């Protein structure tokens, strides 16, 4: 019998497949399996690919919203790419260059390696520069204020609801011109004298000579929609028209946010005195329908219930709606006249009753 020497055993161990090995092919199979499971999760959840690739952002209904969405998605993709590279290098170094018991020397050092340090400095600078450039481009687009908006809306926020007014409408095609500002109501908000002191001089208020209840900075219009505890305010807007929003708060800081605008603006009390820009515009609204809006600034007890609805209709329907309002119809009656639901359909009022009297919300 031929003895089995160590050489024979070594050759046999080399021929026998090692447990747990598989090389690159196994890694590719695992990657393909992960991708298939991810696609299956998206399909089963009922999400569309556009929603999944949007990383949680709505589609957007204005050109500014689309630009903001693209900027966000691009920034996330760039961040993920950088993250994958960095994480990959960390794991690769930890797995393949970890210290072994047989190591007797220090690994190769890269300190003071000028070419490497230049590369690791220039690449992040270029990435940040590109992101900064596109951020400024989108920001300037979103903050652009044109001189001739076709619709001007006054937004007044207060704890815990909204008032919307139509200050001016001037369609470029000449089919609708309307001046809805109400200067008389605005003048009525001027602070009254607070009396006279012991010398017979008129007392002035503590805030720039005005009393603390002064609201002369608020705008008032002939056609307004006022939210109440029983009715969500519905702001009716036309599609395809440049719209300007002028915002002011009657009390604390609020925020005007329509998720499909992909844009939130704080609503400040007395914006001029607080050095706050209270005007923004959208180029147009590209989709008709109902879209919920929220206050996005913590403003007190019922902040979470401070909702409103934006109802986007065609320009012809908007003209008919505004004429109904000018003729004295309520917001609900004017909406019904253009075959729209008279009340909000995206949210419901907060029931102010308590205990067993309050009905349970449906749905």
Swiss-Prot record:
Keyword Metal-binding in record: yes
> What cofactors are annotated for this protein?
Cu cation; heme
Write the Enzyme Commission number(s) for this entry: 7.1.1.9
Region span, Disordered: 1-23
Q: Where in the cell is it found?
A: Cell membrane
EC top class, in one word? Answer: translocase
Q: Give an example GO molecular function.
A: cytochrome-c oxidase activity
GO cellular component terms given for this protein: extracellular region; plasma membrane
Instruction: Give the GO terms filed under biological process for this record.
Output: ATP synthesis coupled electron transport
Catalytic activity entry: 4 Fe(II)-[cytochrome c] + O2 + 8 H(+)(in) = 4 Fe(III)-[cytochrome c] + 2 H2O + 4 H(+)(out)
Instruction: Summarize where Cu cation binds, as residue positions.
Output: 254, 295, 299, 303
Q: What is this protein called?
A: Cytochrome c oxidase subunit 2
Question: Which key words tag this protein in UniProt?
Answer: Cell membrane, Copper, Electron transport, Heme, Iron, Membrane, Metal-binding, Respiratory chain, Signal, Translocase, Transmembrane, Transmembrane helix, Transport
Q: What is the lineage of its organism?
A: Bacteria, Bacillati, Actinomycetota, Actinomycetes, Mycobacteriales
Q: What else is known?
A: Was identified as a high-confidence drug target.
Q: Membrane spanning segments where?
A: 71-91, 118-138
Q: Which residues form the signal peptide?
A: 1-41
* Gene3D superfamilies per UniProt: 1.10.287.90, Cupredoxins - blue copper proteins (2.60.40.420)
Q: Mainly resides where? A: membrane
What family is this?
A: Belongs to the cytochrome c oxidase subunit 2 family.
């Amino acid at each position: 019998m031929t003895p089995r020497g160590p050489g024979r055993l070594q050759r046999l161990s080399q021929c026998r497949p090692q447990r747990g090995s598989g090389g690159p092919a196994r890694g590719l199979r695992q990657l393909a399996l992960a991708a298939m499971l991810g696609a299956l999760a998206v399909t089963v959840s009922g999400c569309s690919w556009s929603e999944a690739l949007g990383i949680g952002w709505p589609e957007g209904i204005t050109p500014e919203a689309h630009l903001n969405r693209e900027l966000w998605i691009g920034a996330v993709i760039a961040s993920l790419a950088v993250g994958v590279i960095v994480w990959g290098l960390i794991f690769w170094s930890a797995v393949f260059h970890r210290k072994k018991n047989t190591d007797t020397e220090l690994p190769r050092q890269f300190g003071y390696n000028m070419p490497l340090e230049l590369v690791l400095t220039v690449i992040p600078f270029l990435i940040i520069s590109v992101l900064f450039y596109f951020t400024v481009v989108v920001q300037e687009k979103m903050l652009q204020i044109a001189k001739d908006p076709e619709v001007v809306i006054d937004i007044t926020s207060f704890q815990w609801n909204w008032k919307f007014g139509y200050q001016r409408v001037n369609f470029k095609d000449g089919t609708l011109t309307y001046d809805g500002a109400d200067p008389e109501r605005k003048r009525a908000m001027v602070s009254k004298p607070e009396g006279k002191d012991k010398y017979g001089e008129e007392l002035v208020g503590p805030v720039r000579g005005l009393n603390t209840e002064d609201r002369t900075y608020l705008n008032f219009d002939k056609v307004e929609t006022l939210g109440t505890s029983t009715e969500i305010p519905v702001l009716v807007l036309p599609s395809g028209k440049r719209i300007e929003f002028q915002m002011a708060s009657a009390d604390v800081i609020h925020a005007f946010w329509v998720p499909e605008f992909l844009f939130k603006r704080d609503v400040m009390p007395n914006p001029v005195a607080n050095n706050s820009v209270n005007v923004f515009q959208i180029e147009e609204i590209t989709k008709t329908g109902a879209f919920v809006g929220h206050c996005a600034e913590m403003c007190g007890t019922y902040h979470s219930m401070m909702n409103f609805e934006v109802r986007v209709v065609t320009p012809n329907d908007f003209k008919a709606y505004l004429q109904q309002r000018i003729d004295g119809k309520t917001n609900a009656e004017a909406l019904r006249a253009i075959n729209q639901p008279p009340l909000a359909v995206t949210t419901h009022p907060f029931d102010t009753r308590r205990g067993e009297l309050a009905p349970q919300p449906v749905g």
